[in-house]
Each structure stands twice: as C-alpha cells, then as structure tokens.
Amino acid sequence: MKVLSLLYLLTAIPGIMSDVQLQESGPGLVKPSQSLSLTCSVTGYSITSGYFWNWIRQFPGNKLEWLGFIKYDGSNGYNPSLKNRVSITRDTSENQFFLKLNSVTTEDTATYYCAGDNDHLYYFDYWGQGTTLTVSS
C-alpha cells in the first residue's frame, strides 16, 4: 500500500498528466443505509479503446483502497471485500463510468477517485481530482 501511495503522489504532480482528463462527480453527502452513486467523466480518450477504468478511495488518515474496475471491453473486477456492495458500470455514448456502493455506513466516508491504468499492475496512469463523500445522518 505504501507503493500505491507513492505512485499516486508521483502521478499527481502537475505536468505529468497528458491530455486525458478524468473528473468525478457525486452527491457529497449520503445518509447511512442509502446507496452511493458517483460518475467519472473521461475526456481525451475513449473508454472503449483501452485501459482499465478504476475507482479508488482515500480514507481520512490517507489509507487508500481500490474498489474495482471496468475494462475497456466492459468486463469488471472488484475488491473481494466489497464485492457484494459495489457495482461499476459505464455509458459509452457519454464516455463515463459509474460507481454504485450499496448500504453505506460512516466507514465509507472518504475521498473517491477514478483512475485509468493500462496494465492493471497497481500503477495508475491517469487520475481525477477526487470527490469527497461524507456519510452522515
């Protein structure tokens, strides 16, 4: 996980990014037991042309957790610890992909990032800026 954190810092340095841009959007606040839906809009590259399109979250205290991906061909992979709660889908016409997380609790409070990687070896080539989610009643 330390390697993942370091790679995140390296890829986040201004000037390293290319013309591919990712932008997350979401509700900001969700009540416990509700579902969370987030959107990642990709510009500069078609999500059907290549890459794994991932969702990752960073908890308060900076721990990172990979949630899952949707591949360019539409196939999925998920973190086994969240497999029953998480779903990642896409809209190819809008060049967007989505995260749905069911039955949220306060433990799901985090900053959520979308990211693209070419080889799925825990190095993420492109990152969004992140969207903060708070779970609170």
From Swiss-Prot:
Region Framework-3, residue ranges: 85-116
Classification via CDD domains: IgV_H
Disulphide linkage map: 40-114
Record region (Complementarity-determining-2): 69-84
Complementarity-determining-3, as annotated region: 117-126
Keyword Ribonucleoprotein found: no
Gene Ontology cellular component terms for the protein in this record: extracellular region; immunoglobulin complex
Annotated signal peptide: 1-18
Region named Complementarity-determining-1: 49-54
Region ranges (Framework-2): 55-68
Keywords assigned by UniProt, alphabetized: Adaptive immunity, Disulfide bond, Immunity, Immunoglobulin, Signal
Record-linked Pfam families: V-set
Region (Framework-1): 19-48
PROSITE patterns: IG_LIKE
Extra information: This alpha chain was isolated from a myeloma protein that has anti-dinitrophenyl activity.
Protein name: Ig heavy chain V region MOPC 315
Species, as recorded: Mus musculus
Taxonomic lineage from the root: Eukaryota, Metazoa, Chordata, Craniata, Vertebrata
